[in-house]
Amino acid sequence: MMRSWVSLILAAGLVACHTEMMKVTELKAIPDAAYAKGVSAPFCGVVGDALVVAGGANFPDKSLLDGGAKRVYADIWAQADGEWVHAGVLPDSTAYGATFAVDGALVLAGGNVCGTTTDKVYELTFRDRAAVLRALPPLPVPMEQCGWTRDGDRLYLVGGVGTTGVYACTVGEYVWTKLADLPEPLVQPVAFASAGKLYVWGGFNPETLEVSDKGLVIPTDSSVIPSEAKESPWAEAPAIPDGGTFVGATGATLPDGRLVVVGGVNRAIFARALHNTPEDRIPYLSKEPAEYQFRQAVYAFDPAAGAWTLLGSDPACALAGPGVAVRPQGGLYVAGGELKPGVRSPRIFSLAW
């Protein structure tokens, strides 16, 4: 969630009527004292057959409720054959960035470094089980808590803290150009690109404090469209299922072309919390995790059908800011995330259906 007080608290679309059988399989946690309390908003992806979790943030010493300080990490952990290896460190301690899986590597873009939004981008590969990092061209503007997605050889970054920009680059070149501006500022949206269209769902407006349940779509072959254009290039997309939001959720594109979204806050509870006063802080942070009603349901969006499908629901998925990556064997990995404001989960598990 965001670092300020706003961050501490942080039209239903078409939904297919059937539910697929979802299986949750527990995996080994990262064997490190700093990660024992879990992290949220890490870089997370798969290189070869190895799950990679890097960076992330938590409150290791004292809880947020007790005035604890957030710590951001630089560690790079890789799991292959069921065992975790400390594979190296990031150039900076980073959380809230974007992760792209690209041809035997991960591209790590933006994030928050020591309280400052960064424009840095790195390629992460492995040599003899050790992480190798190569600096790529920086982003046009610093970005964190943005939406991100890949479609073919194109990567997209959408919104986040301090920008309404939508940016794209080509894999291998990594020179980012601006496609358009969002209709409004959106922090923590979920993005998805398919068949020449870029979709954006959820997010919250840090200026109006409104929490979006809407979907937006724009052609990805558009030239740059100024924000002051008389006609918006954005059209409505099928809204978020159940009238909720995807603030705090993480999306991943499956090999079959569907978007799967895991986690996220409860829209109504989060919207009320955005208006909390300092006097509300202790009562709000003192609640049990279940009282925040983070989303347990996992949904998939099929761009061909233009509809959402409920894949399943499990309390393990009630997380904000989890790392999510596509498993080579099918399904997803889910790593860490927030159980409630300031409290992380150390669990790492897979989802299959």
Task: Provide a role label for each language-model segment.
Residues 20-353:
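Kelch-like beta-propeller repeat domains
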Residues 15-16:
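C-terminal motif of bacterial Sec signal peptides marking the signal peptidase cleavage site
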